[in-house]
Amino acid sequence: MDKRSSRLRRAKRARAKISELGANRLVIFRTPRHIYAQLIAPTGSEVIASASTLDKEVSAQIEKTGNVAAATAVGKAIAERAVAKGITKIAFDRSGFLYHGRVKALAEAAREAGLQF
């Protein structure tokens, strides 16, 4: 089993548990160059808000896109967009990525900006 399939197995288990909760979920996807965050409705069919290092608002604040500072900016942006739509309680879906580094920075920035999870 390689690294990617292990991550996808972890993600599958986590998503099954989150779907039982019936809460909006904050989904993270991380590449070496960028980080993406989407707030998805409990049904899984609607994206409520999104932010990434490719957004013009976020990329104007940062120098590089693949570091902790960029992840912090994305976390703050997604939280502001969610709070603007009246959503504060969510479930955090890290997509099988370890809660460390950029994933942790994004989560902590989202918490500081008003999301609860």
UniProtKB/Swiss-Prot annotation:
Gene3D superfamilies: 3.30.420.100. NCBIfam families: L18_bact. This is Large ribosomal subunit protein uL18. The lineage of its organism: Bacteria, Pseudomonadati, Pseudomonadota, Gammaproteobacteria, Alteromonadales. GO terms for biological process: translation. Part of the 50S ribosomal subunit; part of the 5S rRNA/L5/L18/L25 subcomplex. Contacts the 5S and 23S rRNAs. CDD domains: Ribosomal_L18_L5e (cd00432). One of its GO terms (molecular function) is 5S rRNA binding. Keywords: Ribonucleoprotein, Ribosomal protein, RNA-binding, rRNA-binding. SUPFAM superfamilies: Translational machinery components (SSF53137). It comes from Colwellia psychrerythraea (strain 34H / ATCC BAA-681) (Vibrio psychroerythus). GO terms for cellular component: cytosolic large ribosomal subunit.
